[in-house]
């Protein structure tokens, strides 16, 4: 796996100050994507144990609330194994920090049924996630007032509750969209 960039103080892709990993490789090719260079699986730098160590070091400060995975596409089959290794190490060291992921795949149609690579790896991956923002970016549904998502078709899914209840449960630990806020 390659990665496009790592942001160590991101406030746009989940609650609080976060570390964000932008992986390389995406087969969705959404029209209007803000990160088209990351569609190429060979873009950026190789993801290695040194990369994991760098991310873990960025997660040390108490003000960092967690890690966000974006892309590219973090759920492409070839990206899942390296990401799961990162999450294993992260949760062993920082169990209190949250993990968010953004995916153009749909949770209930593509991810949960195990259609994307090794189902055992996907299940382990899901076990580390707190929130999944699912669905492709749809330019016609773009709305800048939406919090933590680019288009209105995308859902903020509370992954632990969804897995426990066996149905999609939307994440509610937020303050609403920006419409009407002063």
Which residues does each predicted region cover?
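N-terminal [4Fe-4S]-dependent radical SAM core
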Residues: 1-22, 31, 35-42, 168-169, ...
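Short glycine-rich, flexible loops that bind phosphorylated cofactors or substrates
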Residues: 76, 140-141
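P-loop/Walker A phosphate-binding loop and immediately adjacent motor/lid segment at beta-alpha junctions
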Residues: 86-91, 142-182
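Short, conserved loop/helix-junction motifs that constitute active-site signature segments
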Residues: 124-127, 150
């Amino acid at each position: 796996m390659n990665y496009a960039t790592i942001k160590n103080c991101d406030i746009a892709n989940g609650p609080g100050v976060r570390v964000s990993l932008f992986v390389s490789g995406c087969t969705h090719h959404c029209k209007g994507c803000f990160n088209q260079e990351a569609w190429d699986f060979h873009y950026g730098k190789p993801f290695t144990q040194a990369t994991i160590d760098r991310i873990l070091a960025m997660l040390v400060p108490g003000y960092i609330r967690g890690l966000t995975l974006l892309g590219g596409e973090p759920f492409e089959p070839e990206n899942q194994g390296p990401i799961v290794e990162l999450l294993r190490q992260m949760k062993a060291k920082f169990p209190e920090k949250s993990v968010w992921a953004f995916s153009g795949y749909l949770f209930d149609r593509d991810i949960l049924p195990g259609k994307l690579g090794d189902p055992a790896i996907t299940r382990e991956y899901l076990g580390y996630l707190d929130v999944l923002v699912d669905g492709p970016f749809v330019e016609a549904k773009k709305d800048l007032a939406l919090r933590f998502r680019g288009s209105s078709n995308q859902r903020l899914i509370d992954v632990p509750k969804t897995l426990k209840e066996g149905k999609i449960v939307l994440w509610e630990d937020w303050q609403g969209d920006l419409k009407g806020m002063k």
